[in-house]
Amino acid sequence: MKLLKCNVNPGLLLATIATLAVLVPSSEAQGAAAGKHYEPTWNSLSDRRTPQWLREGKFGIYTHWGVYSVPAMGPNATWYANKVYWEPDSSERKHQEQTYGPLEKFGYKDFIPMFTAEKFNAEEWADLFQKAGARFAGPVAEHHDGFAMWDTKYSEWNAAKMGPKRDVVGELARAIKKRDMKFVAAFHHAEEWLYFPTFDKRYDCGDPRYSGLYGFIHEKNALPSKAFLDQWKGKIIEVIDKYDPDLVWFDNGLELITDSYKQEMLAYYYNKAAARKKEVVVTYKRNTLPPGTGLLDLERGQEADLTYYDWITDSTVDIGRGWGYVKGLGFKNLDNLVDNLVDRVSKNGYLLLNVGPKADGTIPDEARALLLGMGEWLKVNGEAIYGTTPWVTAGEGPTRLVRGEGDFNERNDLRYTGKDIRFTVKDNNLYATVLDWPGDRLLIKSLAPRWESWTGWSGLYPSEIVSITMLGDGKKLEWKLTEEGLSIETPKAQPCQHAFVFKIVRRKPF
């Protein structure tokens, strides 16, 4: 982003804008108070601001769980069936036929009786999400495969009538809301139009008897039909009416949906929320909805620097791109997950972390341990995450994200050091989170008081600082502020693991 040269600190300008977005009442609240009615036009829908609960909550969890959890084959479990039907030479097709027989005799639909979810317990899932420190959570309501995870009137191919024979979305909605978390419903079903080759009569996906699962039969390059678009919108509205989600998350595929259908869906959701006097948010992938109509989502990515706009990223606990459960797939370590949460929040972002449960409804032990580890870290350091806003700069340090612009730039090989620091602020407090143990002393160069001709004064002054402590320790630390920066003596013992928060209390609010 290019900034005009002026007598204003550009970092301060970004942080001020980001802070004002929190302090100004959200447009949902304003709209509800004024009795605003949204029209199905981009002009009417383009005044959305992120709800206060999301700006304060920062961290959420969602799940990819469905029929694709039965074969549990990677690299991407949720695209397994697509590869099986479309690519005869793919590893997925070879695995399918070697394990289950010819595709002509055993198709994707035949996994449904095996998707029994006999150990699924919505209360246990919600309890785990709460212990992990999540402030919002929920399931994928329907993925590209056409199998709905709620009791829908639009198709008999759903979890309430087949497979588990349980209303998974409904059970999770009740369990999550009971724990005062906001409820998330994720939709990926726009890409159902392209997911199966329904024109191919050799396989069950081309059989009209199974079109409720595989989708409307159409020619290879046909545009989405009115019947498909009506069903796409109808399913979302049904979930809104039945389960009242606080966040509706959209995957790629919205570019396939005609503008009028997207406009009608958004207007319905926002008007319903206003009638219910609640704040809601819709997320979207880049270039699929106009700016201002929802919140930008960066898949497995993050911004390189502090942004004036807020954003959310969806990432996953595994080291690849499995999303759903994949047998034998490795997991990230807790350092990586904690560091990524801290980094995103410092840059005006939020994290929606995915877990892929097994077909029986259990969450893998490795994933469970990671979530509980996140919760333990947040118990000590959540003060530097929840309810904070960005500072004038996201941070400092030698480790930089240099790949890509936002989407798919996540790096599992990124290793932060004891000199990598990320900043957040709340009230009179500046939180400097170090992404590895800094040793005996920490030097924060960004806090050196200095004058620059076109930015003015920056940093802090000794007279401004009331005290410095480390979260989890609480004892006042010795410090010295010089032209090199703020030098802080660290505690003798580490109060936690993974990342360490210095709380700098200032006499006046930031």
Report each predicted region and the residues it spans:
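Mature catalytic domains of secreted/periplasmic carbohydrate-active enzymes
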Residues: 30-510
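N-terminal secretory signal peptides that target proteins for export/translocation
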Residues: 1-8
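Intrinsic disorder/low-complexity segments
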Residues: 4, 22-24
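Sec/Tat signal peptide C-region and signal peptidase I cleavage site
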Residues: 25-29
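Bacterial N-terminal signal peptides
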Residues: 11-22
